[in-house]
């Protein structure tokens, strides 16, 4: 279901079980949903080389996106700047003053630098552009009902809605819902 002209509803989607279950719940319960947005980290944008797991991005492009579009959902794949640029980034500000002016080098695993500097920057730009076009916007997030700590931490923003929490879907229930749609 599309929202009115003043309000925009989108799902920031990782194409994991919780994100997909959120989309399916929106469709099942006639919740407004204007667009699903996936942010693809690019290794080499100029040559079209993705930085995502090849099996995942192939599944997103060739299975999930067409299936959702057949269900009437607009799916947009945003592409980040090359993540390789993070290797050459000069640190301008840091909690550790001795790092300022140095080159970051290789991103450390599990430190969220790529998520923060690539995915979140691209999504932030999308949200800023959305705010200029609509009076109100809401972002569906795939956080399950049984993820209480994460819900408390992530739902402080009044623009975010968890349909999994609204309909009391646990992670297991989200997985089962996704299985129904292959």
Language model features: what each stretch is:
Residues 1-182:
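Nucleotide-activated chemistry modules centered on ATP-dependent adenylation/adenylyltransferase
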